[in-house]
Amino acid sequence: MQAILNFIVDILSQPAILVALIAFIGLIVQKKPAATITSGTIKTILGFLILSAGADVVVRSLEPFGKIFQHAFGVQGIVPNNEAIVSLALKDFGTTAALIMVCGMIVNILIARFTNLKYIFLTGHHTFYMAAFLAIILTVSHIKGWLTIVIGALVLGLIMAVLPALLQPTMRKITGNDQVALGHFGSISYFAAGAVGQLFKGKSKSTEEIKFPKGLSFLRESTISISITMALLYFIACLFAGVSYIHESISDSQNFIVFSLIQGVTFAAGVFIILTGVRLILAEIVPAFKGISEKLVPNSKPALDCPIVFPYAQNAVLIGFFVSFITGVIGMFILFLFGGAVILPGVVAHFFLGATAAVFGNARGGIKGAVAGAALNGVLITFLPLLFLPFLGELGGAATTFSDTDFLTVGIVFGNAVKYMGLFGAILFIIIVGATAILLKGRQKPQQ
């Protein structure tokens, strides 16, 4: 039984396989020729593997930056990282998390089939992280046994339907259509970025309309501007950390200037690969998903990972990362001055959430909206972990925590509910999220 469960989880937690399976079913339902089904399925897998490869390149290029930064400023503290905290949690909560994930995805599909929230959440690894997260919260709050699975699955299925719905009005502005949704557990940041961006509506041009002097026109190409910006960030960080430290501990004796340049261009290459993968996914999943939306789950939409929005505002991606990270650094020093736990800037989280928040802010309020939205994200992912740490139980001392805002906000609200009210608090939370779903019903119709 455990082997079967592990096999199912392995499939569902791999976005490439999960989305390819959806594309495969969609093409079969449309009665496409075998050649089209094979091509569409393989291209969907290929698109996600390309996206994942790009994300890995970005993450690997950022890892040395985090080490350099910590050494440069001599700060020790908690580094938010989803993968790290989940890997620790699986030792004690693995089976429970797997069952919550499988049952939660079923709940999500049932909600999409029988309600007006037509979003099928396809970011498999994030679904698994949230399942592990819920297993921790419920167990620490002494809700155990089958109740953990039932409550966890209901909460997971509901938020996988509600959060994409919350973002869809701005997603329509970003993409110019209503064919795809965003399925990523940084939704609170993105919604907040869109809301703060709305304050600058009509007051600022889009990030994609930035005009460069003729001599700097090459910076209009995002890959080049990202390369230069990241190389400069690395160069400055290396100077603060000390050349000897870079040579001995980071660059394997490579000159720190050359090292900075290579890391900056590597980061840009990762972003370029991500964008290539996104374009391939969109070209395949949207037509294939028509079979699902027309026959099996009428009018449903795929909710996909956050890089899906990067091609629509590539300048905002760079602005968002930079602003969110700088905000996180400022927040770190504020926490350091006040004593207590210090949240170090998680570079990966600041990139993916900050970039996406800036895209949402830009859609509503142009450049000012992008900057404000990314800064707000930086504040949220720096200070919210402090409120969330008590709900991790014994894992709270692991020097890491969840990094994305939905984990943190759901953890704080849901964690307090079950901590002080037990099972009743969990049920009350489910009712409130369900009521939110009803209120969101009117937001799902495209504006004329």
Task: Please identify what each model-predicted range represents.
Residues 1-54, 99, 103, 107-289, ...:
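Signature of multi-pass transmembrane helix bundles
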Residues 47-98:
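Membrane helical hairpin/interfacial module
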Residues 55-64, 381-393:
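C-terminal TM-helix exit segments that contain a strictly Trp-centered aromatic cap at the helix terminus
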Residues 63-81, 289-310:
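Membrane-interface interhelical connector segments
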Residues 73-79, 97-105, 125-132, 153-157, ...:
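Mid-membrane cores of alpha-helical transmembrane segments in multi-pass membrane proteins
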Residues 79-99, 298-322, 393-401:
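C-terminal halves and exits of single transmembrane alpha-helices
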Residues 88-95, 119-121, 141-149, 219, ...:
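Membrane-helix interface and helix-disruption motif detector
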Residues 113-117, 306-386, 390:
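Hydrophobic alpha-helical bundle architecture
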